[in-house]
């Protein structure tokens, strides 16, 4: 292929976007414990968590200098939405930076509680289900072209997304919950935390029916050119390679659909029934009914998609987005994971895939203590795996001991804590926010609109999420600098 890709990463011959804007929204579970005693309600802890934010910005819904969004979501869940990223490793750094940022807030909240004579530690969990069965999300966002029908795209994507839990689930011990709307599944280990909490395939709702794909038309970009694919079904992941496989495989599938690369129609007869069954089948072999009357297993569906993706890499034209080298790493892990499921020998991925890592940990404790799967000590291990506090959460302990494979580095993650991605619109937002923070200028910011409120309102709208340069932003920052004295009075 000789034609060059555009600045958006779209190849003129295949139509595939190999440079794609994407982001992840993570809701965190929250509690405060003093020993085994719960000290405060989640809404009370959340107030302490966000008090410094509200004191500084007069709001609990803000954009921060690394261009990400930080806010308090429904149900008192702290939520962190990464800035716009255009490559896989950049996104992993941005997502992991969110863990660092909210953990720092938790440490500060503990200090504030102690000053008021309230003991206890604040716990933030990067998981998807609390102890009484309430679910909170980890949502992925992918930019697609406006001419793409999200419903049609969703139908093509659905078999992959429903079976993707096999390769990227977070894993959990599933306890029967009489309070849930579930189907009465028995005690067992599930490979996905989110599978039981979606109720539709494609829908414009997010909380009422929790679809696998949300179709609300909110592109946060030029609405004449782009749509935003909002994937709700994914688990929140701790291991960097699991995040890479979850997002990287999805990028490859989107590219193949856009390029019409010959993925066969494997539309499932019942999406919701299938996703529940797969979550409880670590072999991936339960036959699933397809709409064409045939059956395939989840493992077979993933293998078909993987085989096409491996061939696609030979045709994929590199852009400034995710490199072919990164995608080769994704395919290597994807292939090894499918082989592990096929052979039921998970030793080749037991330092990379969350649900496998956690199950190995639980199995070891269960065997050592001769424990039943419903033993509270195993439930504690299950939960503590997701505690984001370094040195306290089990995941971080394993990673510090070299028992978890890294995809990126602490240095890159810490850089992303304070710096916006440099290759997208996020860079411009970060520049504006840092200048405003330094000068004390009052600004109002969202994904597209950036406004300096005084002395005279100045508004810049950035509709191209791919562009990290803009003369109007330069002028806006110059305006703030010219009125620095105004902001000091």
Swiss-Prot record:
- What cystine linkages occur within this chain? none
Q: What residues does ATP bind to?
A: 69, 82, 447
Please tell me which top-level EC class this enzyme sits in. ligase
Q: Which residues form a coiled coil?
A: none
The record's keywords, sorted A to Z, are:
ATP-binding, Ligase, Magnesium, Metal-binding, Nucleotide-binding, Ubl conjugation pathway
Pathway assignment: Protein degradation; proteasomal Pup-dependent pathway; Protein modification; protein pupylation
Q: Which reaction does it catalyse?
A: ATP + [prokaryotic ubiquitin-like protein]-L-glutamate + [protein]-L-lysine = ADP + phosphate + N(6)-([prokaryotic ubiquitin-like protein]-gamma-L-glutamyl)-[protein]-L-lysine
Look up the EC number in the record and give it. Answer: 6.3.1.19
Q: Which HAMAP family does this chain map to?
A: Pup_ligase
Miscellaneous notes for this chain? Answer: The reaction mechanism probably proceeds via the activation of Pup by phosphorylation of its C-terminal glutamate, which is then subject to nucleophilic attack by the substrate lysine, resulting in an isopeptide bond and the release of phosphate as a good leaving group.
Q: What is this protein called?
A: Pup--protein ligase
Name the species this protein comes from: Corynebacterium efficiens (strain DSM 44549 / YS-314 / AJ 12310 / JCM 11189 / NBRC 100395)
Q: What is the lineage of its organism?
A: Bacteria, Bacillati, Actinomycetota, Actinomycetes, Mycobacteriales
């Amino acid at each position: 292929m000789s034609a060059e890709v555009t600045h958006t990463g779209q190849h003129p011959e295949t139509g595939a976007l190999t440079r794609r804007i994407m982001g992840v929204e993570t809701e965190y579970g929250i509690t405060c414990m003093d020993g085994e005693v719960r000290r405060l309600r989640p809404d009370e802890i959340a107030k302490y968590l966000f008090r410094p934010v509200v004191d500084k910005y007069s709001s609990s819904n803000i954009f921060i200098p690394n261009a990400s969004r930080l806010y308090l979501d429904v149900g008192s869940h702290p939520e962190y939405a990464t800035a716009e990223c255009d490559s896989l490793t950049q996104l992993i750094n941005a997502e992991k930076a969110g863990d660092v940022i909210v953990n720092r807030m938790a440490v500060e909240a503990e200090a504030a509680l102690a000053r008021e004579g309230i003991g206890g530690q604040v716990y933030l969990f990067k998981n998807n289900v609390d102890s009484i069965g309430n679910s909170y999300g980890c949502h992925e966002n992918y930019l697609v072209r406006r001419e793409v029908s999200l419903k049609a795209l969703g139908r093509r994507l659905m078999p992959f997304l429903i079976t993707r839990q096999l390769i990227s689930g977070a894993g959990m011990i599933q306890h029967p919950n009489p309070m849930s709307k579930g189907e009465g599944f028995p005690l067992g280990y599930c490979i996905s935390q989110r599978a039981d909490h979606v109720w539709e395939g494609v829908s414009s709702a997010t909380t009422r029916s929790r679809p696998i794909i949300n179709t609300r038309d909110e592109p946060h970009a030029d609405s004449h050119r782009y749509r935003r694919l909002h994937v709700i079904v994914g688990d929140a992941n701790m291991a960097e390679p699991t995040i890479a496989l979850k997002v990287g495989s999805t990028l490859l599938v989107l590219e193949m659909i856009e390029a019409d690369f010959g993925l066969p129609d494997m539309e499932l007869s019942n999406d919701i029934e299938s996703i529940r069954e797969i979550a409880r089948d670590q072999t991936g072999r339960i036959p699933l009914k397809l709409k064409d009357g045939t059956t395939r297993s989840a493992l077979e569906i993933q293998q078909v998609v993987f085989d096409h993706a491996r061939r696609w890499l030979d045709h994929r034209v590199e852009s400034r987005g995710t490199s072919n080298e990164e995608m080769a790493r994704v395919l290597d892990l994807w292939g090894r994971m499918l082989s592990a499921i096929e052979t039921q020998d998970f030793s080749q991925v037991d330092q990379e895939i969350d649900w496998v890592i956690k199950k190995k940990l639980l199995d070891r404790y269960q065997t050592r203590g001769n424990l039943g799967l419903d033993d509270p000590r195993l439930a504690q291990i299950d939960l503590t795996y997701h505690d984001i506090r370094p040195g306290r959460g089990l995941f971080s302990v394993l990673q510090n001991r070299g028992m978890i494979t890294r995809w990126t580095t602490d240095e890159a993650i810490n850089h992303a804590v304070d710096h916006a991605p440099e290759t997208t619109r996020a860079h411009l937002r970060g520049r504006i926010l840092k200048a405003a923070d330094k000068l004390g200028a009052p600004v109002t910011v969202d994904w597209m609109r950036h406004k300096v409120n005084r002395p005279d309102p100045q508004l810049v709208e950035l509709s191209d999420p791919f562009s990290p340069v803009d003369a109007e932003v330069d002028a806006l920052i110059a305006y703030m600098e010219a009125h620095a004295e105004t902001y000091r009075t």
